Design a protein with these regions (language model features):
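Sec-dependent bacterial lipoprotein signal peptides
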Residues: 1-20
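Long, intrinsically disordered, low-complexity segments
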Residues: 19-20, 74-77, 92-95, 105-106, ...
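An aromatic- and glycine-enriched ligand-binding surface/loop that stacks and positions planar moieties
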Residues: 21-81, 176, 184-185, 204-207, ...
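Conserved, well-structured interaction surfaces
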Residues: 39, 43-57, 78-149, 164-177, ...
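Short coil/turn linking the two alpha-helices of tandem helical-hairpin repeats
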Residues: 123, 144-153, 194, 216-225, ...
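C-terminal substrate/ligand-recognition segments
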Residues: 351-475
């Protein structure tokens, strides 16, 4: 399902989603002379503000995968990569991936500023809905900048020449306060119609992101906040999350896997609207109308790069699969917050684990091996051709179980499984692509389940104590996952409920690019990763991937709580200073 924003053709593809740089085309590409002679041209200009989301530099790879994916539950499986320096903690101020992400965020801001300046005085947006979207996106880009670089230049006018690029940094807290204030102003005129959701921003999208912004501002990662401000921000986060809940416009899809199958197949859920906002991507670049900039699902999918000459026969599209879970995520599913009875019944498995950490990939080695068929029984064994069929995890010589099982077997790679949440299986993607790293899987930016979790967390922090009502907000997530929950009395203290929510966020939202920023706002990003290295390389987590985690964390320090300001930016904007952590 496509909206006008996703059907970029000709000019807009080349301009926004291709390899060219907006500033390389023309210093002031969005002008009154170029656009704004019709409502359709104004819409195209607004597309230019949205289009940055769909770039390789943001949600196609750099921002979400390269620079911010590693955490205590997700790890980069290698230790070095020339094009993934962020994932291997080898970046510095000269790194191109850092520069490109910084630049494209400011492109989005520049496009928004130009749009807001040029739409003024026209009658193409009589209700102010387009202006509200542009203002929200500009605020969102500033929120991302302040999260990643702390103190950043706050530009509210389009740069009309290369002579006025000098601008000092604004403190992080002020940038985030500006972002929150702008988003709040958007609520007055932005549409509450979900017709074009989750591609377009709507009122509940803004409310949900406001909950995220205020929750982040209330945490430990933002410099300069007082205790009184933190308390206020927790309250505002709860208020905005509550508004989404009380709107009645969003529900949990009863099938957890279907939420992501929709994204894989480029389908919008028009029944439940659990996915509230997505970054849309088109495809594998096999044709001009199937041109995309995303490696989402390819870099963080089930590995299928051992293709050989039989790629056309494979039941999956191409994926390098460079990220896996850690042992901590496995144990969060299998042990933490599980009832005693279900811990002893290995057949009772969290459905989120089944979908996210499947016991197979598509990268088998060797010519042929006898295995059980997927979902079949041992009496119907057949030959598996490596790479074409699912390649199960098992220890050499061990009895191979049904490949759809996720029973707790320590020999079944519990801490080194590829991410299955955005798998590129043909049955879900809807087509067999040519052998390409590019794909059209959409990236979730906000889900209703996240709103529920933010509400429960913010209220616990604001009140200093949980309640059974907050506990009941979380229960539907676990009921959908098919697991039982201990009674409220087990989580009735502030500390226990806080940890329960933190664990539940990992189980529900893993591999969606949120965990690092959760750890940052809790003030435990570096510590949580380095503490986990004591487990790596031993016991049930003794794979080479686990040993790589030790190497990655040896490069980790407090400076990795943020990114360095690019050297090229510092050379041009001489009023800007390098981040103090770098």
């Amino acid at each position: 399902m496509k909206t006008i924003r996703k059907i970029f053709t000709g000019f807009s593809v080349a301009l926004l989603l291709g390899g060219c740089n907006l500033l390389d085309v023309k210093p002031n590409i969005i002008t009154e002379e170029t656009f704004y002679t019709s409502s359709s041209q104004a819409q195209l200009a607004l597309n230019g503000v949205y289009g940055v989301l769909n770039s390789w530099q943001l949600y196609g790879c750099n921002l979400i995968l390269d620079l911010n994916y590693n955490s205590d539950i997700v790890q980069y499986m290698s230790t070095t990569n020339a094009t993934m320096k962020g994932a291997s903690f080898e970046i510095d101020a000269n790194s191109d991936d850092v520069y490109q992400t910084w630049t494209w965020l400011y492109k989005g801001i520049r496009n928004a500023n130009a749009f807001l300046e040029n739409i003024e005085g026209t009658d193409f947006d009589p209700e102010g809905k387009m202006v509200a979207q542009a203002r929200f996106l500009r605020a969102y880009y500033y929120f991302i900048l302040a999260q990643n670089w702390i103190n950043v230049p706050l530009r509210l006018k389009a740069i009309d020449s290369y002579s006025n690029v000098k601008c000092p940094a604004t403190p992080q807290l002020q940038v985030m306060q500006f972002a929150a204030s702008e988003m709040e102003k958007c609520l007055e005129t932005i549409t509450d119609d979900l017709t074009f959701a989750p591609s377009d921003v709507t009122k509940t999208t803004v409310e949900g992101i406001l909950a995220r912004v205020y929750l982040y501002m209330a945490g430990e990662a933002v410099e300069g906040t007082t205790a009184e401000q933190k308390h206020e921000y927790f309250g505002k986060a709860a208020d905005y999350a509550r508004m989404v809940i009380e709107s009645g416009k969003h529900q949990l899809n009863p099938d957890y896997a279907q939420v992501f199958i929709n994204m894989i197949g480029d389908k919008y859920d028009k029944e439940y609207y659990e996915s509230m906002w997505e970054a849309d991507f088109l495809g594998d670049r096999s044709s001009p109308d199937y041109y995309g900039n995303s490696r989402w699902g390819e870099l963080n999918g089930l590995r299928s790069s051992n293709c050989g000459t039989n790629f056309s026969e494979m039941n999956t599209n191409f994926a390098y699969g460079l990220f896996s879970n850690t042992i901590k995520l496995w144990e969060l599913y299998m042990d933490d917050d599980r009832t005693k009875l279900e811990k002893n019944l290995s057949v009772v498995t969290d459905k989120r684990q089944q979908w996210t950490l499947p016991p197979y990939h598509y990268n088998g080695t060797g010519e042929e091996s006898w295995v059980y068929p997927y979902g079949g029984d041992p009496s119907d064994a057949r030959k598996l051709i490596a790479g074409i069929d699912k390649t199960p995890y098992y220890t050499s010589g061990a009895e191979l179980k049904d490949r759809n099982s996720t029973n707790k077997e320590e020999t079944y790679y519990p801490g080194s499984r590829y991410c299955g949440k955005f798998r590129r299986e043909v049955q879900y993607e809807g087509r067999k692509n040519f052998k390409s790293i590019w794909c059209g899987i959409n990236v979730p930016l906000l889900r209703y389940s996240d709103v529920l979790l933010m509400y429960a967390e913010a209220m616990n922090e604001y009140m200093g104590t949980p309640s059974e009502d907050l506990y009941n907000v979380i229960l539907p997530l676990r009921e959908r996952a098919g697991i039982s929950t201990e009674p409220y009395s087990k989580y009735a203290s502030y500390e226990k409920f806080q940890q329960f929510i933190r664990n539940e966020r990992a189980r529900e939202l893993c591999f969606e690019g949120l965990r690092k920023f959760d750890l940052l706002r809790w003030g435990i990003y570096v510590k949580s990763m380095q503490d986990l290295t004591t487990r790596a390389g031993t016991g049930t987590w003794s794979t080479s991937t686990a040993r790589n985690y030790i190497i990655l964390c040896s490069r980790l320090s407090e400076k990795n709580n943020c990114l360095p300001i690019p050297s090229l930016e510092l050379a041009v904007n001489t009023e800007l200073k390098q981040n103090h952590l770098w």
